[in-house]
Curated annotation (Swiss-Prot):
It is found in: Cytoplasm. This is Protein HBT1. The keyword Cytoplasm applies. Its main location: cytoplasm. GO terms for biological process: cell morphogenesis involved in conjugation with cellular fusion; regulation of cell shape. Coiled coil: none annotated. Keywords: Cell shape, Conjugation, Cytoplasm, Phosphoprotein. Residues 952-963 have a biased composition (Low complexity). Residues 605-619, 1006-1019 have a biased composition (Acidic residues). It comes from Saccharomyces cerevisiae (strain ATCC 204508 / S288c). The gene is HBT1. Conjugated with HUB1. HUB1 has not the classical C-terminal Gly residue, so it is still unknown how conjugation may occur. The modification Phosphotyrosine is found at Y855. GO terms for cellular component: cytoplasm; mating projection; plasma membrane.
Length: 1046
């Protein structure tokens, strides 16, 4: 996959390069049968891919990869024969020639750099070169040591902004131009020529030449530089500056590399990087022959430039072959990685040491080894960064194909194109740049973002479905694959892929933007740098979008964050572009960040969408497609980003409202649903209930928040279950401070809201990395925390704690969404209200008594209790519990199911807040389960919870414990059927006295809960599951998360 990704990506770069590799010779690239064919195939695939990834995220990616393989591998092989390493595929189009030409690559690379790819490669090359200081030192040393190097570096590093601004004419080019002209032209140009990279330094020629890659090959170095200088190159340079600065190797590589700016541009520009790695690396590889590199620059530049239209391979293979085979090979890995995935480019930048070192390794290996080694190395490099790999793969699907589509549709892409997108689509972007850099880039961004969004959604679902290892603890993981929270939960690990899925596009774009910081970077430095941080401070989601875009998008290279800033600045400049690209970019970075801050971006965004509407996921895709999320989510427009990312992506919620609400956690309804829940709760709101209701409302906000952390439905349940401010606070913390998610997870566990933590953790676990932490915490606290902590969280009420246990059982049933367990769920959700029905009890025949039923439901509810009850309980119940547990396990795996059950358990209250799940669930419920004989034993179990309600708070969940509770449960159960939310809280209202509070409700609802469980059992079996589904849905405020969880 990595190699394929590389190939695919390379193919993308190649295609792009073929299409746009040289402003001067786009036709010749198109004429490349491989690139043209690939172009066709990719362009045909791209539009489909936009839509396809949703349906077949994996298969589409693989199809694209296969296409890329089929198209690129043969071509690569052919060119590998030309001593173009497979990595040259991307390079091969743009970079390969540049990279292959490696030091000629300045021209070749520049030519390609002229197209984004070269710049990107150059960056890689630079990183690589830097990394390959030994080989690179030869030339880099020259570059570095040489005045030109110093000068170039000086320019790049010293005045990246000036560079940008100077070159300002083309935005990206402006940077390169300023830098090149200033450094390259004046001081570096001569030295630059001396240097292989100096040629790049010769930005005077290069600058003009760079964009017109074909243009002045006379100063091959200049040409190369020119490419670097050229928009993408310039952008790359700017970014390269950032990268160079950030990545000393990059800087060094840039300076040293014939493309000081170009290299820088490459570093910045993924396009440039792609080529530049070849160039730089070629330099590195050729660095041994510094003169050779230079010669390559000149010779290859001229030859390659001429050849480039014909084919990168010819360029690479031929002119560069003597030195370039290794250079190519060296560049290959880099280029491949670089072009293969822009993420890698960032990696190269960020991981200049590691990635560069790897490349260095490859530089040495590749330099000496055959191009095939490059493929291996590329594969290794790709493998080196899983996220990078994903980036490659995703980029292929999202970015590469999108770019190819751009190649096919320069105008539409142009419309979307953003200067920032250059880095994302270095190959095609640079080409696009040549064709119509801004517009095309914009189009590319949009297409990529849309396609990335679609692909992201598909892959996200894919990942979410297979993200149980991320969701490890929750059954919800799979069921929640619909849920943004789960996705984000997965995003910690899986969503890295998702991030990478988008990252390549947005990353390329970002790097391009950052690299072509001339437009973006100046603003990026001022606006983007702080904008990103502003986003960070302003909104975690935005921060994720911004900082994470930089860091996360630079999943491979955190160094890219400055670049990202610049790019974002560029994106900011191009609202459309940024918005278009950002959704994938944000997603990618958020996904990547999800490992650290899963909620920062993706969680809020996805969860909001998914929390509130089953179609919200589609909304998310649509938002992405519609650039709702991408536009606003992207940092291009921080305010819009916050607003739409949260508002439009959620669909129902305003992102700002969501974020603020999440932070407030209960200040105002996050969404209509939250409002609805709130209204329902408020109906029965009393002091405690008010809090509880508030918590639930907050929980709905937590739906958004929990979306981040725990997904709306679960948060709703969680809130219902916890119905406690601590839980809400935790959710608020998690959501309000996405950055603090990890902290919050511990906090939740530490908060003493163990149950909140546990429940939330269970949900969290389902929904986000914070949930993971929570679920871990919950797992830790699960038994006791769920019961006691949960109780303690909301109400120090032991009843609440007991309710929590019942809740766990009920929730477990819900979670299991098993008809058998739906019993418990239904009992909790529907039957619970109907619990008073003796017939239900009888029909459940759990003991003919609600206590027996409750006992059964209780045991089902509490995982821990289940264990105890299994021992204590009759084999039939044990079997049922085992069944439920098994279902739970099947849903989320043993760990997830146990954690989920322990944390959330089968929370009837989640289904039906009225259910005394809160007070009901108790670790002691084993005894309560044990005393199937009567409510009293359950009361014993409820002793903690029932301490308050020794009366009817019998073991029976909702049957006899509190008659009004029981009746209310029936009443509420019906209400819940009609309006789950209103019923839930009305239920609390019904139990308006002490039971009015959610906790009391739980008490009163304990019996009702038992009946509810019984009812659920019977009803579930009798087809009441649908009602429970309705209840869950209504409780979750229409959130499908309940079902998904179940």
């Amino acid at each position: 996959m990595n190699m394929n990704e590389s190939i695919s990506k390379d193919g993308q770069g190649e295609e792009e390069q073929n299409n746009f590799s040289f402003g001067g010779k786009p036709g010749s690239y198109d004429s490349n049968s491989d690139s043209a064919q690939r172009k066709k195939s990719f362009s045909t695939t791209k539009p489909t891919e936009y839509n396809l990834p949703k349906e077949q995220p994996e298969s589409t990616s693989k199809n694209l990869e296969t296409k890329a393989k089929n198209i690129l591998l043969p071509w690569r092989k052919k060119h590998n024969k030309d001593s173009e390493t497979p990595h040259e595929d991307t390079e091969a189009d743009a970079n390969r020639r540049a990279n292959v030409t490696s030091d000629v690559n300045p021209v070749s690379a520049d030519t390609k750099s002229s197209s984004g790819p070269n710049a990107t490669i150059t960056t890689h090359g630079y990183s690589y070169v830097k990394t390959t200081t030994p080989a690179a030192t030869s030339e880099q040393s020259k570059v570095k040591t040489s005045p030109p190097t110093s000068h170039e570096h000086s320019n790049i590093k010293a005045s990246p902004t000036a560079h940008r601004h100077s070159k300002g004419d083309a935005g990206h080019p402006s940077i390169a131009t300023t830098h090149n002209h200033s450094t390259s032209k004046a001081a570096t140009s001569p030295v630059t020529h001396t240097h292989g990279h100096s040629s790049a330094t010769t930005s005077p020629v290069t600058h003009t030449h760079g964009h017109a890659s074909v243009k002045t090959t006379s100063p091959t170095n200049t040409h190369e530089h020119s490419k670097a200088n050229t928009g993408p190159s310039a952008t790359a340079t700017t970014h390269g500056h950032i990268n160079v600065k950030t990545t000393h190797p990059v800087s060094h590589g840039h300076s040293g590399s014939s493309t000081g700016p170009k290299s820088t541009a490459a570093a910045q520009d993924h396009s440039s990087t792609k080529t530049n790695p070849s160039v730089t690396h070629g330099h590195t590889s050729v660095k041994d022959n510094s003169s050779a590199t230079k010669g390559y620059s000149n010779t290859d530049s001229n030859s390659d430039r001429d050849v480039i239209p014909g084919s990168f391979r010819g360029m690479t293979g031929t002119d560069v072959n003597p030195v370039d085979p290794s250079v190519y090979t060296s560049t290959g890995p880099k280029s491949n990685v670089s072009s293969g995935m822009n993420a890698v480019d960032p990696s190269v930048y960020t991981d200049t040491s590691s990635k560069s070192a790897d490349r260095r390794k490859y530089s040495g290996n590749t330099a000496t080894g055959p191009p095939q080694d490059t493929i291996k190395e590329i594969a290794q490099n790709v493998k080196m960064d899983e996220s990078e790999q994903t980036g490659l793969k995703n980029d292929q699907v999202s970015g590469s194909d999108a770019i190819q589509q751009q190649t096919m549709e320069p105008e539409p892409k142009a419309a979307v194109g953003t200067s920032g997108f250059v880095s994302q689509q270095p190959s095609y972007h640079d080409s696009n740049k040549n064709i119509q850099h801004p517009e095309k880039n914009k189009v590319d961004n949009k297409n990529i973002s849309e396609r990335a969004a679609e692909k992201f959604n598909i892959e996200r679902d894919d990942i979410l479905e297979s993200a149980d290892d991320y969701q490890q603890k929750n059954i919800k993981s799979k069921t929640d694959s619909n849920w943004g929270p789960i996705e984000y939960s997965s995003s910690a690990g899986k969503n890295k892929n998702l991030q990478d899925v988008v990252i390549p596009s947005s990353m390329k774009e970002k790097f391009d933007s950052g690299t072509s910081g001339s437009q973006n970077m100046p603003k990026a430095g001022t606006e983007l740098g702080h904008m990103k941080y502003n986003d960070n401070g302003r909104d975690n989601l935005q921060y994720v979008a911004g900082s994470q875009a930089g860091s996360q998008n630079t999943n491979n290279n955190i160094d890219m964050s400055p670049r990202h800033e610049a790019e974002w600045s560029g994106l900011s400049n191009d609202a459309t572009t940024r918005n278009n690209v950002v959704s994938p970019a944000m997603k990618d970075e958020d996904m990547n960040e999800d490992s650290t801050k899963p909620h920062q971006y993706g969680l809020d965004y996805l969860d909001d969408v998914e929390d509130y509407h089953e179609n919200d996921i589609d909304d998310y895709s649509n938002a992405k497609k519609n650039d709702l999320y991408s536009k606003k989510a992207y940092q291009g427009k921080p305010s819009d980003y916050n607003y739409e990312q949260r508002e439009k992506i959620p669909g129902t919620f305003e992102p700002d409202t969501l974020s603020k609400s999440v932070q407030k956690q209960d200040e105002d309804p996050l969404s209509p649903r939250q409002t609805t829940n709130r209204a329902g709760m408020e109906t029965a709101r009393d002091e405690s209930l008010g809090n509880y209701e508030y918590s639930n409302t907050s929980g709905n906000k937590k739906l958004s928040d929990l979306s981040k952390n725990k997904s709306g439905p679960t948060p709703t349940r969680s809130n219902f279950i916890d119905q406690i401010e601590p839980r809400r606070a935790k959710t608020t913390q998690d959501i309000a401070s996405d950055a603090k998610d990890f902290t919050n997870n511990p906090e939740t566990g530490t908060t003493g809201n163990v149950d909140t933590t546990g429940r939330m953790g269970a949900k969290s676990k389902t929904f986000s990395s914070n949930p993971f932490d929570d679920s871990k915490n919950t797992d830790t606290h699960l038994e006791n925390a769920n019961v006691a902590a949960f109780d303690n969280s909301r109400s120090g009420d032991t009843t609440y704690s007991k309710s929590g246990d019942a809740e766990t059982a009920a929730y477990d049933n819900i979670k299991n969404a098993d008809p058998t367990y739906a019993k418990s769920q239904d009992i909790t959700g529907m039957t619970h209200d109907q619990e008073p029905s003796s017939e239900q009890k009888a029909s459940y025949g759990s003991g003919g008594n609600s206590q027996n039923q409750e006992y059964s439901s209780d045991d089902n509810i509490d995982v821990n209790k289940n264990a105890k009850v299994l021992e204590e309980d009759a084999p039939g119940y044990k079997r049922e519990v085992d069944l439920k547990n098994k279902r739970r396990t099947d849903l989320g795996g043993a760990d997830a199911s146990n954690a989920y059950a322990a944390e959330v358990g089968n929370f009837p209250s989640l289904i039906d807040p009225h259910v005394p799940t809160y007070g009901f669930k108790d670790t002691n419920t084993s005894s309560s389960q044990k005393p199937s004989e009567g409510t009293y034993p359950e009361t014993t179990s409820y002793s903690i919870h029932n301490e308050t309600t020794s009366q009817g708070r019998k073991v029976s969940v909702g049957s006899m414990g509190s008659g009004k509770s029981k009746h209310h449960h029936n009443h509420h159960r019906h209400s819940r059927q009609n309006s789950s939310k209103g019923s839930d809280y009305d239920y609390n209202n019904s139990t308006h006295s002490a039971e009015h509070t959610p906790r009391h409700h739980q008490y009163g609802s304990d019996e009702g809960e038992q009946d509810y469980h019984d009812d659920e059992q019977g009803e579930e079996q009798a087809g009441k599951q649908s009602f429970m589904g309705r209840v869950r849905k209504s409780i979750s405020g229409g959130t499908f998360g309940f079902r998904s969880e179940i």
